Amino acid sequence: MVFVGKIVAAFFARVAYSVLRLAGWKRKTVLANAKHVAMPVDYNVLLKNLTRHASELLFRFGTFKKLPRDFSAYPCRVDGWTFDIAEGSVPVLEKMRKGGIFLTAHYGNYEAMGPWLCRLGIPLVASYIPVKPKWLNNILECKIRAVDGRSYSVDARTPRDFLRILNEGKLFCLLADQDSRIPSALPGTFLGRPANVNPLPDFLLKHRPQTPVFICWIEERGASPKCASSKKVRVLHAIEVERAQVASPARLASPAPSPSQSSVVNSQFNRWLEQRILENPNLWYSFTHRRFYSQSPEIYNK
């Protein structure tokens, strides 16, 4: 079955890439974003990376649900793929087992972090908007986004829901790289341009100031268009946001800084993501989103 999955995944990725490229899917948005931030994004390479990761999600996702729980078992090889944990990440992952806030982005194979973290014994909870029809949503929640019989997908919408998740000692996951178009969005900068920031992390830290904040991502070492998938090493990175940058009771009582200075997303997460994008802009899939629409809508009408 693993061999068949490899063949089907490779075939699907090629077909999906060809179809989307021919249709020019999101091409104008990608180019508008790239021009706005003066970033050398290769539309074809980005699309090839995106379809490859989508095919792995559809046909190879089960591999991540087989990964070992013990940190000492890494590096390991499962279903022909090699997995490892980055140097210095184990203590952070151990702390994540006690819960907190987990920030990540549409970067690389970001969906695969869900089952991997769950297999490591981390009580991950990720909020997703339910999809329709209901039977498809049930498949997503109970089959795809479930590990060892536990779904890590929840439909949390209110502040009370989010605080309850933290109170239960869960690790709350939030994709924090999208344009926030709600009235409470915070002003900030991203890739040198004005951009709205998701206010949720800062809201949670205001009410639970001792909550640790983590950032995780998967690095594919040896990844290149000519590198076989089986020869890549998938490395899990985990870092903790510096406590000095997180809202504390003392800081909350002091004169209020500007929104961009006080935002943990703007001051820490965006800087981390900018570094990842500089390393490889063709792995940040939010180039296909209108990330700067709230601040600069005109760039998407040219």
Give the predicted meaning of each segment.
Residues 36-37, 42-45, 94-95, 99, ...:
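Non-catalytic C-terminal accessory region of glycerolipid acyltransferases
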Residues 79-86, 107, 133, 152-156, ...:
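A conditional alpha-helix N-cap/helix-loop micro-motif detector
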